Amino acid sequence: MVRLAIVVAEFNYDITQLMLQKAVEHAKFLGAEITYIVKTPGVYDIPMILKELVAKEEVDAVATLGAVIQGATKHDELVATQAARKILDIAVESGKPITLGIIGHGANRIQALERVEEYARRAVEAAVKMARRKKALREAKYNGSTVYID
């Protein structure tokens, strides 16, 4: 069973709370155990929590959830881009899958609401698949024919 953590940004909470509900439902459907749900003030704060979560033995993968809504300036672009970069950095450094379920940049509130379920489900599904495939790869042995991990 995959032990999954979820990190969800509180900013744009009307959207991210719906994302969290959909993510939890989908994790249960996939048979994953949710070991932690951690809220951060915003998307930009997610990487700091990730550093702590990936160090925990009871976390195999993490799904991140958030919504960065377009404003009058390029602030949304800065927040989403920097958060995504750091999230990937932490995943590579830790060797644990961390998936990006962050809506934006450039999305308006209506677009974000339309994407709630899709982004939440995809983030959870990718985290669970990656954790399972990493485990399968660790346990795989090459014996002269192609090893296929799916």
UniProtKB/Swiss-Prot annotation:
The family database entries (Pfam families) matched by this protein are listed as: DMRL_synthase
Q: Which residues form the active site?
A: 75 (proton donor)
Binding sites annotated in the UniProt record for 5-amino-6-(D-ribitylamino)uracil: 11, 43-45, 67-69, 100
Named in its record, the pathway it takes part in is: Cofactor biosynthesis; riboflavin biosynthesis; riboflavin from 2-hydroxy-3-oxobutyl phosphate and 5-amino-6-(D-ribitylamino)uracil: step 1/2
The EC number on file is: 2.5.1.78
**Residue positions binding (2S)-2-hydroxy-3-oxobutyl phosphate:** 72-73, 115
BP GO terms, sorted: riboflavin biosynthetic process
The record, for InterPro entries, names: LS, LS/RS, LS/RS_sf
Keyword Flavoprotein belongs to the record: no
What Gene Ontology cellular component terms go with this record?
cytoplasm; riboflavin synthase complex
| Class in the EC hierarchy, top level | transferase
Q: Which reaction equation describes what this protein catalyses?
A: (2S)-2-hydroxy-3-oxobutyl phosphate + 5-amino-6-(D-ribitylamino)uracil = 6,7-dimethyl-8-(1-D-ribityl)lumazine + phosphate + 2 H2O + H(+)
Q: Sorted alphabetically, which keywords does the UniProt record give?
A: Riboflavin biosynthesis, Transferase
Q: What Gene Ontology molecular function terms does this protein carry?
A: 6,7-dimethyl-8-ribityllumazine synthase activity
Disulfide pairings: none
Protein purpose: Catalyzes the formation of 6,7-dimethyl-8-ribityllumazine by condensation of 5-amino-6-(D-ribitylamino)uracil with 3,4-dihydroxy-2-butanone 4-phosphate. This is the penultimate step in the biosynthesis of riboflavin.
HAMAP family, alphabetized:
Lumazine_synth
Family to which the UniProt record says this protein belongs: Belongs to the DMRL synthase family.
Q: Which NCBIfam families match?
A: lumazine-synth
Q: What is this protein called?
A: 6,7-dimethyl-8-ribityllumazine synthase
- List the source organism: Pyrobaculum aerophilum (strain ATCC 51768 / DSM 7523 / JCM 9630 / CIP 104966 / NBRC 100827 / IM2)
